[in-house]
Amino acid sequence: MFDYKLLSALAAVVEQAGFERAAQVLGLSQSAISQRIKLLEARVGQPVLVRGTPPSPTEIGRRLLNHVQQVRLLERDLQTLVPALDEEGLPERLRIALNADSLATWWAEAVGDFCAEQHLLLDLIVEDQTVGLKRMRAGEVAGCLCASERPVAGARSVLLGAMRYRALASPAFIKRHFPDGVRAEQLPRTPALVFGPDDFLQHRYLASLGVDGGFEHHLCPSSEGFIRLTEAGLGWGLVPELQVREQLERGVLRELLPDKPIDVPLYWHHWRNGGQLLGLLTEQLVRSSAQWLVPLD
């Protein structure tokens, strides 16, 4: 039998990115957390954590974390059927990885009423849509919104739709860098805005226009900051259409190459044995996402 106090310690260390915060969340001392991790490692006969900054799970650690995630969700189902088992009456929590642009646009409206009705709290982890699945693979989250269709072992994926991005810049930026009109081959020689080192959307966009190679760019790991920097004329950027309709109407931002958007698919990944709550959340996302996402051709 598993000792779930030990597994909870492992989950807390990974989820809270360290022993100190894990101790605070569980109401224990750091030494107690460390002792539980050592005891768990003694029981399984191998390390469950790589002691780094932050600590990361080993292969067996990931398997144990996956197990903990699914047990938490199944326990919630049982408590719904037998309310007497839910002695504390605390709201359920789900850890979910998603991309910053979804969080800044449609996510809140899609899940707001659902979370209120289900008495659900969310722990949201922001990751680029191309790499968020690593959190799922590590057993750190119960669900993941990302651009990859292929699920990890033990999970399912469902296509929700696509976020449409447009290449935009301020009128002053366009006048300064493209006085004779915008041509695709000029883009690599003008400053761009990129969300982070894992963001390759600009590379894909330029490749779709037949333009290869590197390009000058700023790094801005904030969806809101990305818009502000674009408006201020620091560079051109690929921006979610959902996020800038007002700016386009007012002429604060303009499209560099009209009718040449790029669509990024969004897949919802969730554990197969995630219980009723995760199933209901999946149904809610499938049902509501069509209001904001475009169909994928």
Curated annotation (Swiss-Prot):
InterPro entries linked to this entry: ArgP, ArgP_gammaproteobact, LTTR, LysR_subst-bd, Tscrpt_reg_HTH_LysR, WH-like_DNA-bd_sf, WH_DNA-bd_sf
Keywords: DNA-binding, Transcription, Transcription regulation
Pfam (any one): HTH_1
Taxonomy, superkingdom: Bacteria
GO molecular function, one term: DNA binding
Domain HTH lysR-type: 2-58
PROSITE patterns reported for this sequence: HTH_LYSR (PS50931)
DNA-binding region residue numbers: 19-38
Assembly behavior: Homodimer.
Protein purpose: Controls the transcription of genes involved in arginine and lysine metabolism.
Annotated family: Belongs to the LysR transcriptional regulatory family.
HAMAP family attached to this UniProt entry: HTH_type_ArgP
Protein name as catalogued: HTH-type transcriptional regulator ArgP
Organism, scientific name: Pseudomonas fluorescens (strain Pf0-1)
UniProt lineage: Bacteria, Pseudomonadati, Pseudomonadota, Gammaproteobacteria, Pseudomonadales
